Amino acid sequence: MWTKPAYTDLRIGFEVTMYFANR
């Protein structure tokens, strides 16, 4: 199973990536 901290960090990283990609 995924650990919550790792999952959250991955999600945040994905959010940031999408944010910069949309710029």
Swiss-Prot record:
Chain coiled-coil ranges: none
Keyword Disulfide bond assigned: no
BP term (GO), one: pyrroloquinoline quinone biosynthetic process
Name the record gives this protein: Coenzyme PQQ synthesis protein A
Cross-link position per record: Pyrroloquinoline quinone (Glu-Tyr): 15-19
Family recorded in the similarity comment: Belongs to the PqqA family.
NCBIfam families with a match to the protein in the record: PQQ_syn_pqqA
Protein's pathway: Cofactor biosynthesis; pyrroloquinoline quinone biosynthesis
Function: Required for coenzyme pyrroloquinoline quinone (PQQ) biosynthesis. PQQ is probably formed by cross-linking a specific glutamate to a specific tyrosine residue and excising these residues from the peptide.
